[in-house]
């Protein structure tokens, strides 16, 4: 008997070096079924363009494999280091692009 009944959600904790990914499936009642967790990593020494491309490819692969109904992304918050915020903002843009093309 299939216990999945609701939305499948791709959760994203955005980052350029490490981007957290998870898939959960709504089950019967108020249950949430974990499906997959992972981290998309990009090499720190690679160019910004290469890193963003790798991140885009990783996210589109997850979307293709798990076919989520919706994407939920953690909101970007300032931690005091401007360059970190800017790099994460670039990653967020690529993640939104990948999700919008699914």
Task: Give the location of each predicted region.
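Phosphate- and other anionic-substrate recognition elements at nucleic-acid/protein interfaces
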Residues: 1-102
């Amino acid at each position: 008997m299939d216990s999945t009944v609701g939305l499948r959600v791709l959760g994203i904790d955005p980052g350029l070096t490490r981007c957290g990914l998870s898939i959960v499936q709504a089950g019967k009642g108020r249950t949430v079924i974990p499906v997959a967790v992972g981290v998309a990593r990009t090499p720190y020494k690679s160019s910004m363009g290469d890193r963003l491309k790798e991140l885009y490819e990783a996210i589109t692969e997850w979307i293709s494999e798990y076919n989520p109904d919706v994407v939920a992304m953690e909101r970007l918050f300032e931690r005091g280091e401007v360059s970190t915020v800017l790099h994460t903002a670039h990653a967020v843009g690529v993640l939104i692009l990948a999700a919008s093309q699914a």
